[in-house]
UniProtKB/Swiss-Prot annotation:
It holds the Pfam family BMC. This is Bacterial microcompartment shell protein PduU. Residues 9-108 form the BMC circularly permuted domain. It is found in: Bacterial microcompartment. It comes from Salmonella typhimurium (strain LT2 / SGSC1412 / ATCC 700720). Belongs to the EutS/PduU family. The lineage of its organism: Bacteria, Pseudomonadati, Pseudomonadota, Gammaproteobacteria, Enterobacterales. A minor shell protein of the bacterial microcompartment (BMC) dedicated to 1,2-propanediol (1,2-PD) degradation. The isolated BMC shell component protein ratio for J:A:B':B:K:T:U is approximately 15:10:7:6:1:1:2. Not required for structural integrity of BMCs nor to mitigate propionaldehyde toxicity, may selectively transport specific metabolites. Proteins such as this one with circularly permuted BMC domains may play a key role in conferring heterogeneity and flexibility in this BMC. Disruption phenotype: No visible effect on BMC morphology. Slight growth impairment on 1,2-propanediol and vitamin B12. Bacterial microcompartments (BMC) 100-200 nm in cross section are formed during aerobic growth on minimal 1,2-PD-B12 or anaerobic growth on 1,2-PD-tetrathionate medium, but not during aerobic growth on glucose, anerobic growth on glucose or pyruvate-tetrathionate. BMCs can constitute up to 10% of total cell protein. Keywords: Bacterial microcompartment, Transport. PANTHER family: BACTERIAL MICROCOMPARTMENT SHELL PROTEIN EUTS, ETHANOLAMINE UTILIZATION PROTEIN EUTS. The gene is pduU. Induction: BMC production is induced by growth on 1,2-PD vitamin B12 medium. Homohexamer with a central pore lined by a beta-barrel. Hexamers pack into a loose array. Interacts with PduV, probably via the beta-barrel which is predicted by modeling to be on the exterior of the BMC. Pathway: Polyol metabolism; 1,2-propanediol degradation.
Amino acid sequence: MERQPTTDRMIQEYVPGKQVTLAHLIANPGKDLFKKLGLQDAVSAIGILTITPSEASIIACDIATKSGAVEIGFLDRFTGAVVLTGDVSAVEYALKQVTRTLGEMMQFTTCSITRT
């Protein structure tokens, strides 16, 4: 009797840690990007955050809006996605405040803020 090859089976499970996995500033985005995202194009910057656990995105929006003149463009409390809008310096400062507060006060692992 010939031996059949076996297939290894792997089960993967998503276990989120406390982390900010993306913090990005888009300075002076094109009007098409605003249109595709459903945002008003009267601002000069978009900030993007991805956070786990996703409920912390609510805290991030609270920190960001209290830090200065930014508005919440999008918040998904189920995926942890946050989009902020405002002028470049306000959005940059908001991203810094969010990553600093989550990192220092709540012991999240944070990433560097990137910019395009």
